[in-house]
């Protein structure tokens, strides 16, 4: 058996390096492909309303396949599941390159992403445990954020040069992720021999949801991570409307740069969490979650660019410190109760449902004519109150 299977293995074992590299390339491809495909839609004169549909089919795949992907991750070696999922992403990107309908190709990438997520996080708990698991999550989040930054920029820059080159670069990134997956040790399946009857799988998934919800620690983690990622996506769209109103800047680049500050901050916060928080001290992350809402409220009142940059980076630092320990807690407790793959699949369902819900509420607020600054203030205040309520509940239970 590979040395990386043992719980006392180095955080930089061959298997862990392969996982981190594969995750970086896969996430790089995801983010570059979004901007490259948006450029393709513009070049082919698709209507503007069609652009958000790309994100909807991507998120929709997570929700639709949530009952099944966790069992897939737990029924096979997770490294091989990751390789198969990246292969689907490669096929989706290549199909767009060769002129297949971009929505169909992007849907295929979404299916691959849905299958990939439970395996990529679940395998961390098989390669390492305990305090090293929090550090491994920090590495995973840091590599993901770096890929988001570089992938987004690369997709946009290459698409301005030539859309086909940008799409080909995405396919190449996915191909590199497939190769990296080959170097992950073939670990034993966590829960082999499960039924593949779709009705039974759906029932099993619902049982996993129920089991995780009834456990105080995993429910705490599920609610916390869902609130965080739902708020993160909403903040991204909030910035697009906030920048011209608050700063008087009407270009397309400034909201992108501000979003980048959040991403950079998350890397810093994830690193701090890996050093300062363990599974036994997860509650240390809760004040950071409350402060996210407070800083968003303060940020909404700004009218200068430099303070906006600084506050958004602070939001990112707080966010990374908040979410990484919660992820690790869910993986460790979920692995023992329903399997790590099922736990992450349930988490994906919660997070993506929260994204759709929060974006829907935000869109409704904009639709009825509420100004963006009051929306930002209310958004920050509600998030701080929600995390405070979650912390109080966690302390009582």
Curated annotation (Swiss-Prot):
Residues 1-17, 74-90, 166, 248-256, 302-304, 365-366 are periplasmic. Its main location: membrane. Residues 39-52, 112-144, 188-226, 278-280, 326-343, 388-397 are cytoplasmic. One of its GO terms (cellular component) is plasma membrane. The chain crosses the membrane at residues 18-38, 53-73, 91-111, 145-165, 167-187, 227-247, 257-277, 281-301, 305-325, 344-364, 367-387. InterPro entries: LysoPLipid__transptr_LplT, MFS, MFS_trans_sf. SUPFAM superfamilies: MFS general substrate transporter (SSF103473). Keywords: Cell inner membrane, Cell membrane, Lipid transport, Membrane, Transmembrane, Transmembrane helix, Transport. It holds the Pfam family MFS_1. It is a multi-pass membrane protein. One of its GO terms (molecular function) is lysophospholipid:sodium symporter activity. It is found in: Cell inner membrane. Belongs to the major facilitator superfamily. LplT (TC 2.A.1.42) family. PANTHER family: MACROLIDE-EFFLUX PROTEIN, MAJOR FACILITATOR SUPERFAMILY (MFS) PROFILE DOMAIN-CONTAINING PROTEIN. Catalyzes the facilitated diffusion of 2-acyl-glycero-3-phosphoethanolamine (2-acyl-GPE) into the cell. This is Lysophospholipid transporter LplT. It comes from Escherichia coli (strain SMS-3-5 / SECEC).
């Amino acid at each position: 058996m590979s040395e990386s299977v043992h719980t006392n293995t180095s955080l930089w074992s061959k298997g862990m390096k392969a996982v981190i590299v594969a995750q970086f390339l896969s996430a790089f491809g995801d983010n570059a492909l979004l901007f490259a495909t948006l450029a393709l839609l513009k070049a082919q004169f698709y209507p503007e309303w069609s652009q958000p549909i790309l994100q909807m089919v991507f998120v929709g795949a997570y929700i639709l396949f949530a009952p099944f992907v966790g069992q897939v991750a737990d029924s096979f070696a997770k490294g091989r599941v990751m390789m198969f999922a990246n292969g689907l992403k490669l096929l989706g990107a290549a199909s767009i390159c060769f002129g297949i309908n971009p929505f169909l190709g992007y849907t295929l990438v979404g299916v691959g992403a849905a299958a990939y997520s439970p395996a990529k996080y679940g395998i961390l708990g098989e390669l390492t445990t305990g305090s090293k698991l929090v550090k491994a999550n920090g590495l995973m989040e840091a590599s993901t954020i770096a890929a988001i930054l570089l992938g987004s920029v690369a997709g946009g820059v290459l698409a301005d040069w030539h859309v086909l080159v940008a799409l080909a670069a995405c396919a190449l990134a996915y191909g590199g992720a497939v190769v990296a997956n080959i170097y992950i040790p073939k670990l034993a399946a966590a829960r082999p021999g499960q039924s593949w009857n779709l009705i039974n799988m759906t029932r099993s998934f619902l049982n996993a949801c129920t089991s995780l919800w009834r456990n105080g620690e995993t429910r705490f983690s599920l609610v916390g991570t869902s609130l965080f990622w739902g708020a993160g996506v909403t903040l991204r769209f909030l910035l697009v409307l906030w920048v011209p109103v608050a700063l008087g800047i009407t270009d397309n680049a400034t909201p992108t740069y501000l979003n980048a500050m959040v991403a950079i901050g998350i890397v810093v916060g994830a690193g701090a969490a890996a050093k300062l928080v363990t599974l036994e001290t997860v509650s240390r992350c809760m004040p950071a979650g409350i402060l996210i809402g407070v800083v968003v409220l303060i940020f909404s009142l700004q009218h200068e660019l430099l303070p906006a940059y600084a506050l958004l980076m602070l939001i990112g630092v707080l966010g990374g410190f908040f979410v990484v320990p919660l992820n690790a807690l869910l993986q460790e407790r979920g692995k023992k109760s329903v399997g790590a793959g099922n736990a992450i699949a349930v988490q994906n369902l919660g997070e993506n449902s929260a994204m759709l819900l929060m974006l829907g509420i935000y869109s409704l607020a904009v639709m009825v004519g509420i100004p963006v600054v009051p929306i930002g203030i209310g958004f920050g205040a509600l998030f701080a109150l929600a995390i405070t309520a979650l912390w109080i509940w966690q302390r009582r239970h």
